A protein has these predicted regions:
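Short, surface-exposed loop and linker segments with low hydrophobicity and enrichment for Pro/Ser/Thr
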Residues: 31, 48-55, 101-108
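Ser/Thr- (and often Asn-) enriched beta-sheet segments in non-cytosolic proteins
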Residues: 21-23, 41, 53, 58, ...
Length: 125
């Protein structure tokens, strides 16, 4: 299920960023080309009662780029009209964002906090 959620997140990010060059770096390999999406940490809270057919997934996505405008543009696209923006439409709710800048490396970091519900029974159920 984690792989499916990662795939869905990649699709969502691609839709949000449009033409911005972006690299999805879920393995932690470093790259300075375009935006880097890394540190996708997920916590799955299963619905133990069985009343509902989905689990709640929370994720923190760290976006790193030497270009602060790209980071701002991406965050704006993802958080636009929250909770009814692009994320909400695809079942993901962006619940917050934080920004930091590293004067030593010149990299700008946006960490997005995400909450989403995924089908606990797998695709097609």
């Amino acid at each position: 299920m984690i792989t499916e959620v990662k795939r869905d997140l990649v699709a969502l990010l691609k839709e949000a960023v449009g033409d911005i060059p972006i690299t999805y770096d879920f393995l932690g390999e470093n790259t300075a080309k375009g935006l880097v999406v890394t540190n996708l940490n997920m916590n799955i809270e299963s619905n133990l009662s069985g009343d509902l057919d989905f689990d709640t997934v929370t994720a923190d996505i760290m976006i790193i780029s030497p270009y602060v405008n790209e980071v701002d543009q991406l965050a704006d696209a993802l958080l636009r009209d929250a909770p009814y923006g692009v994320g909400w439409i695809m079942g993901l709710q962006f619940t917050g964002a934080s920004f930091t800048g590293d004067p030593t490396t010149g990299l700008h970091v946006c960490t997005l906090n995400i909450s989403c519900e995924v089908n606990a029974n797998g695709p097609g159920d």
